[in-house]
């Protein structure tokens, strides 16, 4: 069997490979664009090969190539791999050898890797989220133009009447051109986001677990689908608290000398999922008494931002238990008035 530690970069990779039968070690650098890496792995076809890399961006082509060749790929948690480094000197060669050592010692922090189909649907959600953020930027610019003309409508600016007022505001030359272009962009973005929303609803309807999550107040097709595709199998997480930690919703902790202090949330994990959960939490507190009480208490002590995050964390844990126990919101809430951690 060939075991390969790979320090992956956009244009090249450094490898450390060992043959478990002979003990022979081979190290080298493989360029990507010239096809050197492809030729190297092609030469290993027909043999049992396991490759380990850190979780990095822009590696999808490499993952697909190894799958086509029949090689096994393990993707590891980059932060944990770095924490296991003993030496302070960092080079590509040492990084590749370090990954190889973790693979050989059975200490490689392997991550769950979603299927290509799941990754593709994730692109749908990510594309929608980016367009929503872009639409928000366009709306903010239009609000600024209206404020410069003494018009302050906030959300009412996007009603039929508000839009008419905005279009009729007296503006000169390039200011009027900017307004016209921004309105055209807004219309186009609304159309594109609407199309993506329909695609998200269609994907959500095909998945029973997403429909189950949508029984919880505040959880719609976007949040439910993103949650299922981000979390993967719930069996990966023995406890709800681990889900909150995985999503970066647990406060940072510093404990030393018997003193324990907590800071802001870690913000590790999927940024889009955290954003969606916070947005869903703001709706959930309007319909769920327990969440509303918790939100009110923390908001009174601190302010609304940490209160929203707290509700998002509780919501994430609730959704986890709904999936684990295959229970709807009504069934789960009746059994557990307090969300389990």
Language-model segments: which ranges?
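A detector of single, family-specific signature residues
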Residues: 1-341
């Amino acid at each position: 069997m060939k075991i390969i530690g790979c320090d992956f970069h956009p244009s090249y990779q450094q490898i450390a490979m060992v043959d478990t039968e002979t003990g022979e070690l081979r190290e080298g650098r493989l360029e990507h664009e010239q096809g050197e890496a492809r030729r190297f792995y092609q030469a290993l076809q027909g043999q049992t090969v396991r490759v380990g890399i850190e979780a990095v961006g822009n590696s999808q082509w490499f993952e697909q190539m190894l799958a086509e060749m029949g090689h096994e790929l393990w993707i590891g948690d980059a932060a944990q791999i770095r924490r296991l480094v003993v030496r302070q000197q960092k080079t590509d060669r040492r990084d590749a050898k370090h990954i190889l050592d973790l693979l050989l010692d059975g200490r490689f922090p392997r991550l769950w890797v979603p299927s290509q189909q799941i990754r593709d649907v994730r692109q749908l959600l990510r594309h929608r989220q980016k367009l929503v953020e872009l639409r928000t930027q366009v709306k903010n610019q239009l609000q600024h133009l209206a404020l410069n003309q003494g018009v302050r409508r906030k959300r009412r600016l996007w009603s039929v009447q508000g839009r008419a007022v905005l279009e009729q505001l007296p503006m000169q030359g390039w200011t009027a051109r900017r307004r016209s272009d921004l309105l055209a962009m807004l219309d186009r973005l609304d159309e594109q986001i609407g199309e993506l929303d329909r695609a998200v609803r269609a994907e959500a309807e095909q998945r029973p677990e997403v429909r189950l999550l949508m029984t919880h107040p505040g959880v719609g097709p976007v949040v439910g689908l993103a949650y299922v595709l981000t979390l993967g199998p719930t069996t990966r997480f023995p406890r709800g608290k681990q889900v909150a930690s995985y999503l970066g919703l647990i406060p940072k902790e510093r404990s030393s000398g018997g003193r324990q202090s907590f800071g802001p949330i870690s913000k590790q994990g999927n940024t889009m999922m955290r954003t969606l959960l916070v947005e869903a939490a703001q709706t959930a507190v309007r319909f769920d008494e327990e969440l509303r009480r918790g939100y009110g208490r923390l908001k009174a002590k601190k302010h609304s931002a940490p209160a929203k995050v707290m509700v998002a964390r509780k919501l994430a844990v609730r959704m986890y238990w709904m999936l684990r126990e295959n229970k709807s919101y009504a069934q789960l809430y009746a059994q557990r008035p307090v969300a389990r951690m």
